[in-house]
Amino acid sequence: MTAHAVRDLEEIVDWIARHDGPDRAQHVLGRIRAAVDALKRLPERGPHPAELIALGIREYRETFFKPYRIVYHVDGARVFISLIADGRRDMQSLLARRLLAG
């Protein structure tokens, strides 16, 4: 997981803990971790984010624990998680800032 993705996950868990309680936050954390762990078995299974396909970018893929989107890329046998975000956010802007700006 990149430092940005770790921070994304911490912010998600903190927000849920404040608004929905620590038990719900731990549940979401466990489900997101399970989705990430599943990538070890079949990393190429995730679709390419539509927002990036529209720009001709097919380097990244995504998996979900709805409403959360986990954006990653595969380099050989390694999977790099680049972004974890609530899919209800403005993903076009978020992906552009995070992935395209460097």
Residue ranges of predicted features:
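PIN-domain endoribonuclease scaffold, especially VapC-family toxins
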Residues: M1, H27-K40, Y60-F64
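Arg/Lys-rich, positively charged N-terminal/basic patches that mediate binding to nucleic acids
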Residues: M1-R31
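Generic structural signal for secondary-structure transition and capping sites
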Residues: G21, D37, R41-E44, Y68, ...
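Basic/aromatic recognition patch in beta-strand/loop cores that engages polyanionic ligands
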Residues: L42, P47-R78
